[in-house]
Amino acid sequence: MAKKIQSYIKLQVAAGMANPSPPIGPALGQKGVNIMEFCKLFNKTTENVEKGLPIPVIVTVYSDRSFTFITKTPPASVLLKKAAGIKSGSSKPKIETTGKITKLQIEEIAKTKKNDMTGLNIESMMRSIEGTAKSMGLIVED
């Protein structure tokens, strides 16, 4: 018989840097999950990812306090900031620009995110990521 799911916990954790401090500790502790076990498994899973990159993770907690988790790709905004070499997006996107990004870089980001963006082809994903770039004040060049 399958285990009964108690709850889902959505977190964003820096790759390779999971530790029991907030927000991880309290979120998992409330559900009775072994926090250190999660931290060790998460850090091992994300050891091939650039350290410090925020990784969305969905933790499934079962009624017997066991858990499984799924890691996603970093948010598009983080990948765009990294590709453009900027610290943050513009506070006034239509008025101020923060940097430039090429279509080739957007295509690379789309290919990175293809597993998380279901039901879309590469062109659709590129348009979506272009929209995110524009809302951050980035200029998209050909």
UniProtKB/Swiss-Prot annotation:
| Membrane recorded as keyword | no
User: GO CC annotation: what is one?
Assistant: cytosolic large ribosomal subunit
Q: What's an example GO BP annotation here?
A: translation
Instruction: Summarize the protein's role.
Output: Forms part of the ribosomal stalk which helps the ribosome interact with GTP-bound translation factors.
* Assembly notes: Part of the ribosomal stalk of the 50S ribosomal subunit. Interacts with L10 and the large rRNA to form the base of the stalk. L10 forms an elongated spine to which L12 dimers bind in a sequential fashion forming a multimeric L10(L12)X complex.
User: Of which family is this protein a member?
Assistant: Belongs to the universal ribosomal protein uL11 family.
Provide the protein name: Large ribosomal subunit protein uL11
Q: Which source organism? A: Buchnera aphidicola subsp. Schizaphis graminum (strain Sg)
Query: What taxonomic ancestry is recorded?
Result: Bacteria, Pseudomonadati, Pseudomonadota, Gammaproteobacteria, Enterobacterales
